[in-house]
UniProtKB/Swiss-Prot annotation:
Pfam families: MIP (PF00230). This is Aquaporin PIP2-1. The modification Phosphoserine is found at residues 280, 283. The keyword Acetylation applies. Changing residue 3 to A: 2-fold decrease in water transport activity. A motif (NPA 1) lies at residues 107-109. Aquaporins contain two tandem repeats each containing three membrane-spanning domains and a pore-forming loop with the signature motif Asn-Pro-Ala (NPA). It comes from the Eukaryota.
Amino acid sequence: MAKDVEAVPGEGFQTRDYQDPPPAPFIDGAELKKWSFYRAVIAEFVATLLFLYITVLTVIGYKIQSDTDAGGVDCGGVGILGIAWAFGGMIFILVYCTAGISGGHINPAVTFGLFLARKVSLPRALLYIIAQCLGAICGVGFVKAFQSSYYTRYGGGANSLADGYSTGTGLAAEIIGTFVLVYTVFSATDPKRSARDSHVPVLAPLPIGFAVFMVHLATIPITGTGINPARSFGAAVIYNKSKPWDDHWIFWVGPFIGAAIAAFYHQFVLRASGSKSLGSFRSAANV
C-alpha cells in the first residue's frame, strides 16, 4: 500500500509520516485457523466478565449503603460519582490490559463501530460480541452469587428507563452517549495521531475510560447508562424482571446507532479512508 502524500507550499509533494492500515477483509478464513484469534476472543470474554463483576457490585454496594430502611444513611456510599468512576476506571484498566491481545473492545457497540470502519472482520466481530455477552452474564452471575441477599432487592444493576423520561429521551441518551464513546475510541487509536505522537498508543485507554466516566455522569439518571449492550444484556438475563426486558431494546438499538454514526463521522467526514473502506466492501461483494 503506497503512502499518502500531501502538498506543501513551496515544496511540492512530500510523503506523510503515517500509513493507514488496509481495511480488514470482510470474511477472513485464515484468522479462524490461528490461536491468536481465539486468544483474543477469550480475552474479550474475561475482560467483560471482570467489567460487569466490579461495576455491578459497585452499584449494589452503593444502594445498600444509601438505603436508610436497611441501616444506611442519606448520601451514603460512593454516590453517582463513584459509580461513574467504577465504570470508567474499569474500562481504562481493561483496555490497557487487553489492547495488545484483542484490541480491548469490551463492548458490542465498539466492536460494531470498528467493523463498519473495516477495522475487524465479520467473524471476529460476531465472536467478540458473543464472548462479550457471555462474559457479562457470568460477571453478573458472580455478583448475584456473592450478594444473593441484596442482588434482587436492589435491582441487580439492570438498566431500565427511569420514571419521568420518555422512550425517545432514553433512546437519544444511549445514541449520544455511545457516539461519544466510539468517537473517542476512533480518535484515540487513529494511526495518524499514533505515528506523530509516540506516547498516544500508551495513553489511549485513558481518554476511552474518561469518556465512559463522563457519559455515566450525564445519563445515569435517565437510563442507568447502558452504552454497552453486553452490560445491559448480562444484567437483564440474571435479574430477569419485566421492567429491564421491556426497555431492553433501547440498550441495543441506541448504542448500535450511536456507534454507526461515530464510525461514519470519523471515517467519511474526518478521514479520507472512508471511501477506501466502501470500495473494499464493494470489491468483496463482487468476488
